[in-house]
Structures are given as C-alpha cells and as structure tokens.
C-alpha cells in the first residue's frame, strides 16, 4: 500500500540518481513508441473533455478505438494528478478495446495538469499543494463524482452501455475504486486498486 507518510518522505527527497534518470528515459521512450504505434495505425481517437460534475467542472482525457462501441473504463490518477504518463496508460488500455476516461481528481480545486510529472510533484512541494485538494475528496464527494463520470461515459457514442464499466485507481485513488463501485453498482462491474493508500482507517 501507499501511505501519506511515505508520500511526504518522497516529497522531501527530490533528487534523481543516475539509475532513476535512466529508468525515466526508458519509460519516456516506451511511451513515445506506444503513442506513435497507435497514431500510425490510426486506431485511436482522443480528446480533452470537460463536463459538469458536483463541485465544479470536471476536466479529463478521453481515448477510445476510432470505431465501434467498447466497454468504458475510469482511470483515476495518483496524487500527482492527470498528466502525460496517465494518458499513455489510457492509450494502452484503449488499444486493447476500451473507451477510457482519465478524470482530473482535483477538478474541484485546479484544472489539470497540476504537475508535469511525478518528479515535478516531488521537487515543487507537491504534498503541500495537494493536501487541501485531497481534503475535498471525501468518500461522499468521490461517490457523487463517480456517478457523474459514469453518466457522462454512458452518453458517449464509443461506450458500449450493454457492458459493465471498469474503474482503476492508484495510491491515493485506490479506495475510490471501491467507493465508486458501491456508488454505481448497476454499471461498475470491476474495480482494481493498485498500491492503494487509505484503504482502511480507524473511523467506522
């Protein structure tokens, strides 16, 4: 699991060593290759989107196969928010035959991107910046947002409403997958939390 104290410690250690830099370079090359392959095949359609949601206007990134209807997927980013790395992940899912929305998890506070990448988050006081934003994402707020996201997805021509929606979350947003599935059980049929933080707590 990924906990807030671990994230705070990461934020105080912003330096990147040579091995980390090499890994980042390799990931960037892979990301570029995936995007170029998809674009060359002409198989994907993508766009930035905005729509009304509880507490404000939600902005996000939507990508799907260029033709046909496909199961919807909600991809909640981690604490560094909607950024290029998450768009790459969404494109990879879309190439597998899904209509993927990456919502800005902090839309109530600031439009995306809030950070260029995770290193930008670490080096520029990311934890201090997002702390107040995170407080707005209560379980009730996340449930309400998920309902709006599902409603929006179901209005898209590329989404197959006869099939269930999947939701995945990372670190901070890991619990959101469970909250979302409970909020819209008739539509969300699969939930995956990756190194989710705050999955359990002391409060009843």
Regions found by a protein language model. Give the residues of each.
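N-terminal secretory signal peptides
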Residues: 1-16
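N-terminal export leaders
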Residues: 16-30
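Gly/Ser-rich "nucleophile elbow"/oxyanion-hole loop immediately N-terminal to the catalytic nucleophile
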Residues: 118-166
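Flexible "cap/lid" loop of the alpha/beta hydrolase fold
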Residues: 112-120, 197-204
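Short beta-strand element of the alpha/beta-hydrolase
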Residues: 70-78
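Primarily recognizes the serine-hydrolase "nucleophile elbow" in alpha/beta-hydrolase
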Residues: 146-204
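Short amphipathic alpha-helix adjacent to the substrate-entry channel of hydrolases
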Residues: 84-103, 107-112
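N-terminal cap/lid segment of alpha/beta-hydrolase-fold proteins
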Residues: 37-68
